Structures are given as C-alpha cells and as structure tokens.
Amino acid sequence: MTLRYNSPAVQLSLLALTLLLTTAVRRLLNSFLMHEPPNNINLTYDSYLPTSIISCVAGFAGIFLANLAGIRSILLFYSFTSILYLSSIIVVYQYDHYTFHTACNIINSAAYDLSRVATLVVVLAYPNERWKARALATFLILEYFAMTMGNIIAISDHSSENSRLHSTIAALCLACLSPFVAVAIAPTHDVVRNNGVYLIARKTTLRDEIKETIRLFKNKYMLLLLPYMFCYPFLFGVAYIPFPNIEAIVLYDVGRLIVVFTSQMLDVQWASRRTRGLMALLVTSIFCTASSILTIVMRRAHMDLSGIKPSWGETEILAYVMDIALSEYAALMYATYFFAGVASSSVEFYGFWVMGTLTNDLKASARFVGTFHSVMSIGGLIGIELVTEIPHHYTTSNSLTYIAFGMSLISFMVLFVVVQSITESNDWTLGRMRNSSAPDTLSSPDGSSETVAVIAEVKYQHHNNV
C-alpha cells in the first residue's frame, strides 16, 4: 500500500525523527556532557525543586497549547529550545558561565514536557486500534533507550573536556536539523486514517479550553484515574532507592522494556478490548506489587550502621549504606532495580493506553494526557520532598513506604472501574456529541469506530477558511 504524506504512518515517522534529534540526543548526552550521573530511580520528578515545579506547570500548559497552538508549533518550539540548550553547554565549556545554561535548561525542560504531552496525544490518536499499544510502547522505549545509553556513558566515560566539547558541537549540529523535520509535520486535521476517515480535530478557543478543562475534573473517568496517576510515583518518591552502580542502571532500564510484552497483550486480537485491558491491569498490578514488596524488603534488610561517623553528611552516609547493601544483599538489590524498572514503565504505559481507549477526540485526549503527566510529576515530587525531611530516610523510615504501597493498591482497584468501561470503539467523547439525525457509526476493518455525524460536524480543513 502506498504511503500518503498525510497518513498516520508517515506523520508518526516524522514525529519519531524529530524526537531522535531532540529528546534522544539530550537524553543520550546530557549526563555525559554536564558530568551529572543519575542518582535515583524516580524519574517522574527533577531533584531541583524550581525545575520540578516548572515541569508540573508545563504539563498542564500542554493541555491548552496542544489544542490551541497545535502539535507542530509545540515541536518547533521544543526544537529551538533544544538548540539553545546545547549552545548553552558550549558557553559553559568555553567561558565557565552557568547563568545562560541554567535559563536554557529551565526553558528546554518546560518545552520537553510540552512536547511529551503533544507526542503522547498524537501517538494515542494516529494508529488504528490494533497498533495503538505497540506504537505507544515504541515511543516510550525510544526515550528509555536513549536515557539508558546516556546513563551508561556518563558513569563509564573518562573523556577529556575537549572531547566533551566536540561531542556537544556534534549534538548541536544534529539538533539544528530538528526544526526542518518538525515543520514538515502535518496539522492534525489533515491526517487521514487508512479507512479514509479524517481524525477528529475540532476548532477551539482559549475560553472553551478553560471551560472544558474545568469540566474534565468533574468527569467520573478522570476522578477515578487521578489516584492511579498520583500514587505509584508517590511510592517511588518515598521509597527513594538510589543507583549504586552501572549494573543497577542497566537492570532498571532493561526492566522498562517489558512494556513490549504488555503492548503485544493489548494489541493482539485474542479477546475483546475490555478483556485485554483487564488482563493487562492484572499483569501491571502484579509487577507493581512485586516491585513494592522487594523495595520494602530491601529497606528492612538488617545493616550494621555502627560505622557511620557523626561528621558525615548525607552523601557519605548514602555511599556507606550502598556499599553494605551491595556486599551483603546484592541479589536482592539488583532484583529490586529490575522490578522497579518493570513497574515504572508499566504504570506509565498502561495509564496512557487506558486514556487512548476512552476517546478518539484529540482535544479531549490532550486534556487527559496533560493532566496525567503533571499529576505523576506532582506525586513523585511530593514523595521525595516528604522523605528528605527525615534524617537518614533510606535506612530509618518505612512508615511512608507502607502508606504509599497501600495507596497504590487502592488506586489499582479504582482503575478497575475505568477499565470495565472500555468498549470496542473509543465512544466516550463521541457519545456526548452524537447527532441523532445521521447514521450512528462507520466501522473500519482495523477494529476502530468513528461517529459519522460527529466527523461531519467537527472535521474542519484549512481550505474551508480560504
């Protein structure tokens, strides 16, 4: 079959190439270039509080910008901020001046969160139902793989500063190509599925977006999804398991690749979509429970802390504890990292997939995805801020871990109600906009369903305004 420029496959390929030139380059080289090795498995927050707050706000801002400015505009903005960020690293190497770098880092971090919302909205909307989960897993793994390689490079590298400068220049040259790819991405209302039906893309205004976003928090699905969004990142935050070495990082990142298995379970047509969703929920719950139990066992493991000196700071105490854990509980510790990777990616992947099953409307999808992204960041940030107030929290405090574990179990039970509402078509938003004067649905061979009356009402093309 000949690929059309406005087909989902071509547009997703352009999106992937844009992310390779921006997100992948930064994830691959950031720690290496700035001498910042990873220090914690909770990747839903930034250890720098102001940047974390900006990240949370950017997720919510993505709701409005994805719908008002469009996907292409967000990706163009992200491309230019990536160029600025890499340029700021060159400034650091040449002039040892960090003010410009700090400003560019904050702007680029905000742009990254905006682009992530836009990317997930598109990835959930463009593929047909038989490829939705696998497309989502592919884009997540693209980011995971780049982050894994970047972490390995950062820890194992002993390059000179001159070599790092040359690497930065090469990365900047790659990033400079990203705006040309981003500008080639078609507007969402021009994308046509393989059944000949345009994607649902409604005109909107800022006033409408504010009103609909407020209404979103009265929607039963969003209210039921909120605990799931918050609880597991919160558990990661309060558990606080640092990376002791490169092996732990590799095991954690290998564990995150398990989403490939889950995506196959969700996409292969062996049962109804609701049944597949329930089975994936069970598998995700098992992964998360196993990870939580291993984390609790690891934190409760007996360690001789008599060697800790009163003059030591948090860094020295942490290094001492990690050395004991690696010498006495290495197998348990590595298993904890592996299942932590499995659980973290499974929670994120499954949450976004559930949202993709609720609606084919890109505007509603952006509101769900933006909220999910920000609430996850808030959960992780609150968790880590709570435990850092407790002295030696990684050895002496488990009460918050127990509470967070209980909260996460309850959130899975609540999510069960949402999954029970999944149908073979994404008819939640469409049902609210149905026009009874026209035929109900148009089925497609890929298993999706579109409401003809809605498409006739909400589809708009740029030539209509000419």
Enumerate the predicted regions with their spans.
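Conserved MFS/SLC helix-loop-helix module at the cytosolic interface between two early adjacent transmembrane helices
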Residues: 57-96
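Cytosolic juxtamembrane N-terminal segment immediately preceding the first transmembrane helix
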Residues: 1-25
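Non-transmembrane, juxtamembrane loop and terminal tail segments
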Residues: 1-3, 191-213, 425-466
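Helical-face signature of the major facilitator-like transporter fold
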Residues: 15-23, 52, 86, 101-113, ...
